[in-house]
């Protein structure tokens, strides 16, 4: 949401937690091999964030990650990778992923925003929906139709903790173990692009259930959002929005939530720390 003209007082800090409340968040070590783990009554999640040409917090973070050399993911400029195990069944149509805000942003939207959104809706993600001009703006997509890669894993036995995950994974479309039968029984296409198109249909999403205790992996990213330059590059349009960043308008949230109940499962905050602002250094390994 944010061509090379990066303002010197802009640095990123990425945090993640189970709720909107930033007090529940922990610092994400961007481009690091290990995830942060988040537990809540709703799920257990492991989260990795990768960003090309990263210069943000914490100090000493790698500027890149091997993820960006993989043939499938090399075009992306950033990535949010998730490994999820839900505490209860979740209907596929209820699972939303996207951005929202707790304050109006209409006065901060740069010229060209509507044209850029039309390009996104028409060419990149037809399933996206939202209202950027409301008092509580949002842009959500059905998660199953918007994630670049989606992998169905094993079922974790009851009363068994979600196992530790491998370091620095690149999640690719497919399945592990008993997850292969799940994909086959649901008729999920093997190709990632075909799967996103498959799940654009509401009834198809309603017919898919993310099972309690089963591990699901997802990867989301794109080449359009440039956090180094604080610009959006969609086909035919570039929006440089660094000048719209302020102390009151400096957080881009990615949210995984339930459409029906409104419950948030995960909140990942991309915060622009302005020059002179105090940097938080919470290094916790896990948040409940």
Regions found by a protein language model. Give the residues of each.
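Extracellular Ig-like/FN3 beta-sandwich strand-entry sites
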Residues: 247-253
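Extended, solvent-exposed segments with strong compositional bias
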Residues: 125-243
